[in-house]
Every structure is written in structure tokens, then in C-alpha cells.
Amino acid sequence: MQNEVQSICIVGTGFRGLGVFERIYAYAKKNRSTKPIQVHLIDPTTDGPEQYNTRLPDYLLLNIVCGQVSLFPDAVSVPGCPPTTGPSLYEWVRERRLRLTEDGFTIGDTGRDINYGDFLPRRLLGEYLLWFREVIKKEAGLLFEIFEHKAKATNIAKDAYRYAIQLSNSEVIISDYLFITVGQISEPILSSFGYKSKTKYISQPYPLPEQLETVKAEERIAICGLGLTAFDAILTLTIGRGGKIVVKNGVENYIPSGKEPQIVAFSRSGLPFFSRPSLGAPLKYEPIVFNQSAIDGLRNKVGMKLDYDRDILPLIFTEMRVAYHRAKYGRDYGWEKTQKLHTDFRYAFQTGNLEKLLNELDSHDSFVFSHKDYYFEFYDTSAMGFADSTSYENWIRRWLENDLKESRSGTPLSPIKAALEVLREFRDIIRYAVDFGGLTNESAERFFSFHSETLNRIGVGPQKEHTAIVLALMKAGILRICLGPSPEILWDNYLKYWKFSSKVFKLQQVITVDWIYQGSINRRQHIGENSSIVGAMAHQGLLRRYYPESAVNYAVDIDHNFHPINQNGIANERIWVLGLLCEGATFYNGYVTSPDKFVRSQFDADCAVSSIFSQIMQ
């Protein structure tokens, strides 16, 4: 038994799966005398995850700057075993002498050098991901056997200690340890509108541009969504069909190719995403009031389960005000002087005078930053009393113009953007408060139906350049955002078109279109309906929903070590579920890993693999 081969299966080789693979290599390198190991990598795709597919066109960009992307973990994220070292995405493209052409997105041999703060084509991240896989595979192959399976894991059988994984190509893999790192399958969003027809309905957003090739120039298409996936579709139908952006007097203008359809975009909320700001001045600092100690103090005071609106939001809003005034002070008086203000903030907090100090700073500001407006009031479009679609569309245009102005100023010169970045920079503290049942059931339901979407809208938006393109398309009459939130959708089977009717305007807007494109990833799918191994595990009782009564939370139930809980309430300690399948049991699982900082996903992988090797070495 001492020399029995230990088999580890990783189902899904995106960011999470390859993070686990790197950790297995690192631990095997450190513990050379362990039992023989086999690692099985199971994934039907060879071109990377669909959002980062290596065949994507260059105009589909990352919404994070290349200098903030790395698959190689920092030591702080992997305390159990030293990290594998290697280049960040920025260093990787520089090593290959890739250059950025004049249009701002095409990569080639000509043009300017790529900078740390550039938003690069997503296909490059896909290529970097595949390169990382090959680097780890080459080194790890000297330590253990690696088997790659270009297939889908569809079923599972379990005996006392091991698992038999059935693949779509009829292979069966016997495994001692199993990692499920696949994403959730997108549910057609029209089901949330009570309509399930697939007539001229493009229900799967990717791959692009292939999914939109059947849409003709003389047709009209409605895009369900105003976020990143919707932006991808809009760019595919315009820039991807030969349209050009020409800047005149500092304003972007769209020159059509004649191949564009007419585009109408809408969403459930009727609200756009905030665009990502230019980065510059060092805004990072230790939070004054919103930190883990504050969360622990709340739990000691009110109980282990918190109410997000009552307990956590006030801390976040105070921290946003601190960030706003800190950035404003740095802009007006120089960043070297902000440390004194930050010291004043900390002393005021310790002496119970922070609110007084913030109010005093507000009184000297001609523009009073309303954190609640940016978080709440702006987000109920149904209550704004728009007379008609024109007034709503004009509001959208002004909103985008103002946001673009702030994003171009960036965190060095926009106190508003600096304040909003709190929601992104301190996301781990939100996780600390929310994860693993940290909220009451009622609060968790509201968090995952409203707050998580608001946090994403503020912190995970498009590049400012894409917002400028949207404004240019609206001005050119190619794109309209005119229906308001959650319009009524009907299919006219006689006339063969889709009919949209606004619900919140005093004068109703009615529009007909030829096509509907699902421009958002709808992850509200019951795990039992998943066609992969996840659905099979649910049917066999190997896992269950985290909160089965929820109308918005479809996460897999896991313990604090990411082991799935079976139908009898017992953790499967040789299985780990990591990533988007946990969204609801934990918060914000779909993100790109960064260098030189703590990354929770890499920490989780380290803990899981550490536990495997502690068993193997016994």
C-alpha cells in the first residue's frame, strides 16, 4: 500500500484548475519521497476558457490592466509551499516583444511598446494561460505522470474510497482525489422573463464573432444586458464588422462600415456599468473602519450572522468617504501630504470623532460626495419618473459621459473614482463578512440579488475606451438604450419578430426586433440541471444546494475547506469544489489572479493540495 499510485483528477483547466495543478507540482517538488502520483486534466476545450479563447478577435479586451494579471502565485497566497515563479502577463508580452498598434487594441510587430497599464486583447490571456499550463506540465512531468483528456466529465460512481469518472469519450478514470473547477452553465435569460422560445434567440453568448454571424446588416437585434458580455456583442457587431472610431477635437466619432445591424440594448435594472478608471497615484492604504477586526467586533455584539445593510454597509460608506477626501487632498495639495490626513483620520476614529472630521471636510467641499447616491438612489430607474424613452436615453447618455470623464481623470485626479475603488480594493473584507453563512438568510438573499450585482456594476465594468465607443455608437444612431428596466418581451409568431414594450415610462416605448442575443451570463441554474459531472453528483446525492429555498442563490453547498456537502449533510473530504459553482456560499469567485498580493483562490488551492499531501505522506 505504501507504493500505491495516488490519482488526482482536475475537472476544468481554467484559472482555478491550473491553480490547483501548479500547487500539486509545487508540493510534489517539495516532497519527493511521497507515493507515486498521477494527475488527470479533464477539459473538452483546447483554446482556453470561452471568455479568453485564443481565437477571439483583438478588439475584445480585458477589463483589467495587464500589469495586474499573473498566474504565478505570490508567497503570501500559498503559505504551505513555496510558489512557482514566472512572469506576469505584462512581463510575458514584453518578453515576446509584442506591440500595440495605433487603434489601441490590435497586437502585432509594429506600433508602440506595451505598458503596464494597457488593456490587452483577451486572447492573449488565453495564450498566456495555455503557456502557463505547458510550463507547469513540462516541469511536473519529471515528478509524476500527467494525463490530458480532451473530453467532458459527465458521470461519477463511488466506492468506499475512490471515484470512477465517466468521460464523454467513454473513458473511465479512477481517482482518489477530485477537484471540480468548472464554471456554471448559463441559463437562457428569457426564462426569467417567462419565455422559453428559441426562435431567433441567441442564448449562448460565446464564441464570438461566430454567434452573431447570422445577423444581417438590414436587421435589428436586441441585446439583453448592459455589462461586459453585452459590450462584447456591441463591439463585434460594429468594430468587428469594419466600423472605425475617429477622434475629432477630443471626441470619439463612429464611422460605420454599412455592415452593422441596428442595436437595442437593455437590462433587468436598466443601469449601465461604471467604467474602469485610469490608474496612477498610490491609493492603497490600510482601511480605517472597514476591516476584519470591525467584522469580528460586530459578531461579538450582534451575533455570528450579520445583516449586510444594517451592519456592514455603514462601515463601507464611511470608508468610501475617507477614500474620497484622501484622494481629493492628494489631488489638491500633493500626494506626499496625504499621510498626515490619513493619520488624522485614524486618530479621529480612535477618539470617536471620525464622523465629525468627515462632516467638517464635507463643509469645505463645493461638491459633496454622496456615497449613498452612487450606491443606491441612482439604481432605481423605475422610480425616476421618466416621461418617455427619450428622457431615459438622454439620462443614460449624460450618465455615461460623466462617468467617462471621471474615469479619464482616474484615481489620481477623481476622488469619486477613488471612493468607488474601495468596493474593489477591500473585496476580501466583504468576503470575510459574507462567506460561509456570515449573513442571515434574509440578508444573504438580498445580498446576492442586489448587493453583489451593484458591487459588480461598480467594480467590474468595461474599459473607459469601450464606454467612449458606446457613446459614439449612440450618437451615430447605431445603438439605442431606450427601453428602461425589464421590458415586456413577446414573440409574434405571425409577423415573425420580437416585440419589446417598456414598463416604466409614462409614454410607453414599443420596439420590434429580428433577433435577441443573451448579452449576460445568467448563472441561476439548478445544479441538478447541469449536464456535466456536477448534475450527476447532484442526482446521486454527492452534493446539494447551499440554500435550496433561495430564488437567487444556486451555489453548491460546501464546508469551510470547500468540500461539497452531500444530501445527508456530510462533507466529501476527497472532493473539492472551487470557483463559480460556490457563488452564493462564498462571494466573488470569478476573477483573474494578480501578482504581488494575496489572492484568495490561490490560497484555497494551496490549502486543498496541502491536505492531500498530508494524507499521501502518512
Task: Give each language-model segment a name.
Residues 67-70, 87-92, 207, 291-294:
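Short, solvent-exposed coil/turn linker segments
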Residues 44-45, 55-64, 70, 77:
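Conserved small-residue
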Residues 71-130, 456:
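Conserved N-terminal/central alpha/beta ligand/cofactor-binding core
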Residues 1-56, 107-617:
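Flavin (primarily FAD) cofactor-binding/catalytic cores of flavoenzymes
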Residues 14, 59, 69, 82, ...:
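Compositionally biased, intrinsically disordered low-complexity regions
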